[in-house]
Amino acid sequence: MATASTAATFRPSSVSASSELTHLRSPSKLPKFTPLPSARSRSSSSFSVSCTIAKDPAVVMADSEKIKAAGSDPTMWQRPDSFGRFGKFGGKYVPETLMHALSELETAFYSLATDEDFQRELAEILKDYVGRESPLYFAERLTEHYRRENGEGPLIYLKREDLNHTGAHKINNAVAQALLAKRLGKKRIIAETGAGQHGVATATVCARFGLQCIIYMGAQDMERQALNVFRMRLLGAEVRGVHSGTATLKDATSEAIRDWVTNVETTHYILGSVAGPHPYPMMVRDFHAVIGKETRKQAMEKWGGKPDVLVACVGGGSNAMGLFHEFVDDTEVRMIGVEAAGFGLDSGKHAATLTKGDVGVLHGAMSYLLQDDDGQIIEPHSISAGLDYPGVGPEHSFLKDVGRAEYFSVTDEEALEAFKRVSRLEGIIPALETSHALAHLEKLCPTLPDGARVVLNFSGRGDKDVQTAIKYLEV
């Protein structure tokens, strides 16, 4: 049963400062904000900053290196600092128009930590409307599939987020942000979507709470996910196709931000991933942290311990961070994120941001990005619309750099094979996003000791992807 304590965890931090919305590659132009000597001892209301221009973030020793040099545990720095940064990643690179809205959002977010009515309402909705808690399911036949000839092998468990209302993890964040928007008095909701699951979740909660809903979706993704487009419209949402750029998730996000800048007084932006400007990466993570909290509780009930390995797909990274966050300080628990390698890492047609990207700024935050030598965004590719994004959440970038999490990639072909394999072994059709994580088991399981317990976040169901799979699979 979901409780207020498992529904969300809030960690106070002060407002971050910066002022660029568009993508930046030239580090010499990035402002570096430094607290005045006594700032950390002051209240947030009296917080001050001084501003200098950094020559290059690469010249400034990364926070992870400082921590290691000092002999400290780098995971203790995993929470964002007073500027919304995870090490050198994150921050708030937005136009002045949005600064007040983001500060207002952050203040409201923290106030919910002590708001018993909000926590109670959220817990009840997660339980009775979303259907939490989601099961931690022992995948018996998948486990048998990975047994070696000597009978040894890992034990595979699936965290069944596909059983949530709307069929994916996205509803956790959408319902919490909708409640938050009501507290802010915002009647108009906008969101971006790639695979359509976040769009469906947002349209669902807007119908539930009587809010106006506008969804931005790339025209290419609308073709790939026609079923979800119909579902959103059936729920009363206006779906606006985005034809600019690559007509995928990146461009949908850009259009949503433009809308927000124009209508900031009346509109709340339900960003769907742990990306974007502070406080979104922290806020979305905390609303999804219920996944990891339940996993810890369920693991203790099932075998009296923790998982040995956590596995999740990574596009923007919300489902992975929802699972990982609870276990970040448990350094004996491996955390593995799986990106989309598309046609292959050397093909130039992939979405493996953490594997092949460089540091830059996109959609309001500094993180790893797919970009060329001139700092222009490279068009990503994945058969999965939900992983087809050229950036990643800043906390994932931080966890990669400090070595706390591992990140690998899986091709379209490998994901399709896993889509078919798991459907036939377990009778569960996975989303193509989830199929990337499932595909990595082929490489991971042979390396694990006998009896190692692997928890894979089954982030969504595959009904939406059947039309795509028909084009490539023989069944």
Curated annotation (Swiss-Prot):
Matching Pfam families: PALP
Catalysed reactions, as listed in the record: (1S,2R)-1-C-(indol-3-yl)glycerol 3-phosphate + L-serine = D-glyceraldehyde 3-phosphate + L-tryptophan + H2O
Keyword Lipoprotein: no
GO molecular function annotation: tryptophan synthase activity
Residue span of region Disordered: 1-44
Residues where N-acetylthreonine is found: 52
PANTHER family associated with the record: TRYPTOPHAN SYNTHASE (PTHR48077:SF3), TRYPTOPHAN SYNTHASE-RELATED (PTHR48077)
NCBIfam families: trpB
Function, as annotated: The beta subunit is responsible for the synthesis of L-tryptophan from indole and L-serine.
Homology family: Belongs to the TrpB family.
Name of the protein in question: Tryptophan synthase beta chain 2, chloroplastic
Naturally occurring in which organism (per UniProt): Arabidopsis thaliana
Gene: TSB2
